[in-house]
Amino acid sequence: MKVNYKFRTKPYKHQITALERCTGKTAFGFFMEMGTGKSKVLLDDIARLYTENQIDFAIIIAPKGVFRNWVEMEIPIHFWEEIPTYMSSWQSPMSSGRKEEINRMIKATGKMKIFVMNVEAFSSIKGRDVGEFFGKKFGDKGLIAVDESTTIKNHKAKRTKTLIKISKLFKYKRILTGSPVTNTPMDLYSQCEFLGEKMLGFSSFYAFQARYAVLNSIKMGKISFQKVIGFRYID
């Protein structure tokens, strides 16, 4: 790690290690326990990529209950002071003042632009449209990150499908979570698919499930379906 990086807050050794490991990677997951400072690592990563002229836009997506923390605490505390920055965030319903603020951010030049959204917004058409707009406009030099990425573990959820589609528009992708598995190993698939198509080497969720899940055929009258009763090959 370069020693001349102008960190706003001094990183711990494990944070430097995480930053070193994501260097040069367009897709990366910060699987770090709560309280270890993964938010700071992401912001240092974004700042580093900006100084290397790799990105000039980042969209950070987090659960509704915490996404304001990024705006009010994490970014002001940790993002590098030397970098000129324009930050804005999602609001629903969108006020005229916020629309003007976002338009100024879009037009800003010579600055790192950071936009923060709550993940729940991507279940709506408006949220989807905003994400797609930013991806098409800034994605070639942009980064998309999902904080608490288990919020997109359900491969059937509308927001999951939307964010996987939008992620393909961005050059850099990051996910953050204490543990990517909260229920079953199947939780991994959509989070990794967000990082990149076939990231786990499977063409679909069902191919992934067929490999690692033990399935039992259930018949209820004229209806039949596959039920997961266990897992294999996960050691």
Feature locations, PLM:
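Conserved helicase ATPase motor motifs in RecA-like P-loop NTPase domains
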Residues: 33-35, 170-185, 193
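PAPS/PAP-binding and catalytic site of the sulfotransferase fold
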Residues: 43, 74-75, 184-196
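Amphipathic alpha-helical transducer elements in NTP-driven molecular machines
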Residues: 185, 234-235
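SF2 helicase/translocase NTPase motor core
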Residues: 1-160, 165-171, 199, 203-228
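Aromatic- and glycine-enriched glycan-recognition loops and surfaces
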Residues: 231
